[in-house]
Amino acid sequence: MATFKKFNKDKRPKRNTQSLLFKRKRFCRFTVAGVEEIDYKDVDTLRDFIAENGKIIPARLTGTRAIYQRQLNTAIKRARFLALLPYSDQHKI
């Protein structure tokens, strides 16, 4: 039967604690700008919330409030349907 070594916590590599402590506070760009409704025709703004592979970036990463995230999802999907934005990264923007 195989024997297992006990893991020694002292030999683990140390993490850089400064990079873990300093995280930029996320804020909602639409709240700051006073936007009431996100427009699907504003392609430049919508591109900021789409990843390189074409996926919509979640609110926990962008800091967007829930009401604006729902509007953003709808606007991106409309822009994709009207061929203003690509569905995937295989297409040129």
From Swiss-Prot:
Pfam families tied to this protein: Ribosomal_S18
Keywords of the record: Ribonucleoprotein, Ribosomal protein, RNA-binding, rRNA-binding
Biological function: Binds as a heterodimer with protein bS6 to the central domain of the 16S rRNA, where it helps stabilize the platform of the 30S subunit.
Protein name as it appears in the record: Small ribosomal subunit protein bS18
Origin species: Acidovorax ebreus (strain TPSY)
The keyword Manganese belongs to this UniProt entry's keyword annotation: no
Subunit details: Part of the 30S ribosomal subunit. Forms a tight heterodimer with protein bS6.
GO BP annotations listed: translation
One example GO MF annotation: small ribosomal subunit rRNA binding
Family: Belongs to the bacterial ribosomal protein bS18 family.
A GO cellular-component term linked to this record: cytosolic small ribosomal subunit
Record-linked PANTHER family: 30S RIBOSOMAL PROTEIN S18, SMALL RIBOSOMAL SUBUNIT PROTEIN BS18M
